[in-house]
């Protein structure tokens, strides 16, 4: 069941019967959020973390967010959290207040089922209402699926940091993908 949180998410999807719903994350969702994140670590494509994180380490991360500008949303299907999206502060300085770094993770069993697309559509639909005008994604250059998702939503490569990460002894490049919300011309 979708619930209405500070950002007012969830009710519109549920009322339309549109499948999975997107809603504000709560502390009750932390176990699922952490499990989904930790499932991404072994693949070495979606995060620079190399060891699992704990629910307790994420509790402060969730509590300290300004949900009016930098919320965490979960995508729920059949009562189960199958993905999540976070809006992170970019660089933490006032001049960057309208820019957010997006983090998006999907449960392995729910990948390629439209979960990431649903979360991204919500981000674009509600981003301006959060006071945001620019989204950034920091994506490993070998993460083809995330790059393709971002490209579908109009993200362009704004930076390329060669060999800045070492994962299992392999140097990895990091791409900075960006989009201005008013410039978006693809995925509706």
What is the role of each PLM region?
Residues 127-139:
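Conserved GNAT acetyl-CoA-binding A-motif
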Residues 112-125, 147-152:
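Conserved acetyl-CoA-binding loop-helix of GNAT-fold acetyltransferases
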Residues 52-109, 120, 126, 180-182:
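Acetyl-CoA-dependent GNAT
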Residues 21-33:
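A short beta-loop-alpha structural element at the N-terminal edge
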Residues 86-89, 94, 136-139, 151, ...:
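Conserved catalytic-core motifs of GNAT/GCN5-like acyltransferases
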Residues 111, 137-147:
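Conserved beta-strand-loop-alpha-helix junction that forms the acyl-donor binding cleft
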Residues 20, 80-84, 172:
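Glycine-rich phosphate/pyrophosphate-binding loop shared by adenosine-nucleotide-utilizing enzymes
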Residues 34-62:
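Conserved GNAT-fold acetyl-CoA-binding loop/helix
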């Amino acid at each position: 069941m979708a619930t209405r949180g500070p950002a007012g998410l969830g009710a519109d999807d549920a009322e339309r019967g549109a499948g999975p719903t997107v809603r504000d994350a709560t502390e009750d969702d932390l176990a699922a959020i952490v499990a989904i994140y930790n499932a991404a670590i072994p693949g070495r494509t979606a995060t620079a973390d190399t060891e699992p994180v704990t629910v307790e380490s994420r509790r402060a991360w969730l509590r300290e967010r300004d949900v009016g500008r930098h919320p965490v949303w979960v995508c729920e299907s059949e009562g189960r959290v199958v993905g999540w999206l976070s809006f992170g502060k970019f660089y933490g300085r006032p001049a960057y207040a309208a820019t957010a770094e997006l983090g998006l993770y999907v449960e392995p069993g729910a990948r390629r089922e439209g979960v990431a697309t649903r979360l991204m559509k919500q981000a674009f639909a509600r981003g301006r209402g959060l006071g945001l005008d620019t989204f950034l994604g920091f994506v490993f250059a070998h993460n083809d699926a995330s790059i393709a998702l971002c490209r579908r939503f109009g993200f362009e490569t704004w930076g390329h940091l060669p060999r800045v990460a070492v994962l299992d002894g392999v140097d990895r490049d990091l791409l900075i993908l960006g989009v201005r919300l008013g410039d978006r011309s693809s995925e509706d």
